């Protein structure tokens, strides 16, 4: 449901009715549990919850990186976080899908090229990105949509001097943080990248997320990348995972 409809419906439901909401309406509401089971302590909260808000796609990628950094003390809450998100056009909803898939689309058009948007720095996922990550300030975020259907990567640069950590500490901390995660895989620091880079649609058709970490030769700059399907772990896959937990089913039942 759209945000307004979700807010209108909720007062009509009994408190003991289990609700899984996919809009942005309740993601920062203290009365709701955030639907990212891999965050520390979150799985048990979701299991026992009657109100779970499914994360936004871009937010999922950013939070998967920023939350552990702050929670583990690898970066301060005051750190000036920024990120870039690259997505297939399905991430823009029905209107954008129709635009990209229109039979009237010219053979060569502006849609062939990546498009940055949200340049007013007020993307609707920013409130949850800040709150769930435990940040003192709103992160700077620029999304980019490209001419392919689905798949997403979110890139978070980290100045290790400002963060007060080493690359090894960051890599070890994040690996331990997600060691028991059912749907998140952490790659080793500077692990050889497939095809010397990361294609944003590499995880398309899956409900999993993979995290990559690289560091420069000087050891003072890192790039952390969350790679997943915006329609999978960034949307319906996350919803199914949370539903399974709320209903007492196997966490990954029905997931790819």
Residue ranges of model-derived segments:
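N-terminal Rossmann-like NAD(P) cofactor-binding subdomain of oxidoreductases
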Residues: 1-111, 117, 214-217, 253
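Residue-level signal for short, function-critical loop segments
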Residues: 57, 162, 230
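Predominant activation on well-ordered alpha-helical scaffold segments within soluble catalytic domains
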Residues: 63-70, 126-130, 175, 212, ...
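C-terminal substrate-binding/catalytic lobe of Rossmann-fold NAD(P)-dependent oxidoreductases
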Residues: 80, 84-85, 89-224
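NAD(P)-dependent Rossmann-like dehydrogenase/reductase catalytic/cofactor-binding core
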Residues: 208-256
């Amino acid at each position: 449901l759209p945000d307004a409809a979700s807010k209108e419906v909720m007062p009509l439901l009994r408190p003991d009715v289990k609700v899984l909401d996919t809009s942005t309406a309740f993601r920062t509401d203290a009365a709701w549990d955030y639907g990212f089971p891999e965050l520390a302590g979150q799985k048990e909260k979701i299991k026992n919850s009657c109100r779970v808000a499914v994360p936004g796609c871009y937010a999922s990628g950013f939070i998967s990186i920023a939350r552990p950094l702050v929670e583990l003390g690898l970066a301060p809450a005051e750190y000036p976080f920024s990120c870039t998100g690259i997505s297939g056009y399905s991430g823009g909803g029905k209107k954008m899908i129709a635009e990209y898939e229109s039979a009237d689309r010219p053979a060569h058009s502006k849609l062939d090229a990546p498009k940055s948007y949200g340049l007013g720095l007020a993307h609707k996922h920013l409130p949850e990105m800040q709150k769930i990550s435990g940040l003192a300030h709103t992160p700077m975020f620029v999304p980019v949509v490209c001419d392919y259907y689905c798949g997403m990567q979110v890139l978070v640069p980290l100045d290790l001097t400002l963060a007060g950590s080493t690359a090894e500490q960051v890599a070890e901390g994040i690996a331990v943080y997600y060691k028991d995660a059912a749907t998140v895989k952490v790659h080793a620091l500077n692990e050889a990248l497939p095809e010397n880079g990361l294609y944003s649609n590499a995880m398309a058709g899956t409900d999993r997320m993979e995290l990559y970490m690289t560091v420069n030769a000087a050891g003072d700059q890192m790039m952390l990348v969350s790679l997943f399907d915006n329609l999978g772990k960034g949307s319906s896959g996350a919803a199914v995972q949370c539903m399974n937990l709320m209903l007492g089913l196997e966490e990954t039942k029905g997931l790819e």
